[in-house]
């Protein structure tokens, strides 16, 4: 089911079978049902599965607008959970990193993301472009 045009649904789907590292949890990010990019979270600070709202606002820490997500009933703006750039689980303390997984020359898949800044920029461009048209963005975090 595709949402109407004024609501955007972002799904972060973490798969137990995906090769995650000791420190990180990998997943896939979908926007309105279409695959967008890979994700990485710090296992210690991973976002609990659930339903969140997203605001696109200024981040003092990063000095720019970034998507920030929160649980309306448990809202703690000081926590500042966001989608942002980063390559390894150590780059996150509860946020979701966006980027691309890749194969190493040895034939194994990397435990890090690459092109994270590019994917963060692409995600922000979607929010910039749709800011007037989309009235609400919902984030669903699930482990399958």
Where do the PLM segments sit?
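Cell wall/extracellular polymer interaction/catalysis modules
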Residues: 1-137, 144
